[in-house]
């Protein structure tokens, strides 16, 4: 599992876009513990907590060297598959795909799809409740091979039903990149994010869904869009993100250990 830190390139998106994949690959090839042999073929498992979704395509490029195309299970209030000329169209030159404005927190899955990093017809959005610029948004999303589960669906299906839909669609052997935007959680519970949307899931509901999809073959994950400047004095957003990260990591370890995960030494989770 990748361990390390990466410097940010504020306002130099084109640099981050080109350099981050190499850094993640290099970090992922390191030995995961002192006696382990370093990997030679790339990043086997990659988990990050970046502040922005601009990091996601880099992780998918790094994982692509080991797994090829991966399915994406994307928890978010928003699609994030917009064509750059549509989101936001005001300052994008549609004739120049090398513009750094093509690479935003709402276009990164469009970028990843165009680079053939995402396994089509195996990828899922969950928790959606975004406003659309038009019906074309969903049509473009469908054309990229995504299935959508709306935030409201949890009222009818329950957390277990949402998890079952994801598992049934993706399967348990397909390599999966799990991407979690903190704005999946309702803005009243996790206000510290850049694009909050009311009417989201509770933290408990998201955690129940994540536990329900433990059977997925998760090879990479992120928890993104936490903005401490907008968090409350109780830091509820940061706490929620930390718990979500804990759930993801423990689920990955649990699957990796299999039966070996039983009977381990108990540890305290509080001082």
Spans of features found by a protein language model:
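Conserved alpha-helical scaffold segments that buttress catalytic/binding sites
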Residues: 1-271
């Amino acid at each position: 599992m990748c361990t390390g830190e990466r410097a940010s390139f504020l306002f130099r998106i084109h640099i981050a876009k080109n350099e981050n994949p190499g850094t993640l690959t290099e970090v992922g090839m390191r030995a995961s513990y002192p006696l382990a042999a370093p990997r030679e073929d790339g990043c086997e498992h990659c988990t990050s907590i970046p502040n922005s979704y601009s990091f996601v395509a880099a992780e998918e490029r790094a994982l692509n060297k080991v797994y090829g195309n991966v399915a994406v299970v994307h928890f978010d209030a928003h699609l994030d598959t917009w064509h750059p000329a549509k989101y936001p169209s005001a300052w994008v030159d549609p004739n120049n795909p090398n513009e750094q404005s093509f690479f935003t927190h709402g276009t990164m899955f469009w970028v990843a799809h165009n680079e053939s990093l995402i396994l089509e017809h195996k990828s899922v959005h969950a928790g959606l409740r975004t406003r659309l610029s038009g019906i074309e948004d969903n049509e473009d999303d469908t054309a990229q091979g995504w299935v959508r589960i709306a935030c409201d669906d949890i009222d009818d299906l329950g957390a277990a039903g949402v998890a079952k839909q994801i598992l049934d669609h993706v399967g348990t052997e397909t390599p999966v990149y799990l991407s979690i935007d903190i704005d999946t959680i309702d803005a009243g519970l996790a206000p510290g994010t850049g694009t909050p949307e009311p009417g989201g899931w509770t933290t408990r509901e998201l955690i129940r869904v994540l536990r329900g999809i433990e059977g997925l073959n998760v090879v990479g994950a992120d928890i993104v869009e936490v903005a401490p400047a907008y968090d409350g004095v109780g830091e509820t957003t940061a706490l929620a993100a930390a718990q979500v990260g804990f759930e993801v990591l423990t689920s990955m370890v649990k699957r990796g250990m299999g039966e070996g995960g039983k009977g381990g030494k108990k540890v305290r989770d509080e001082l």
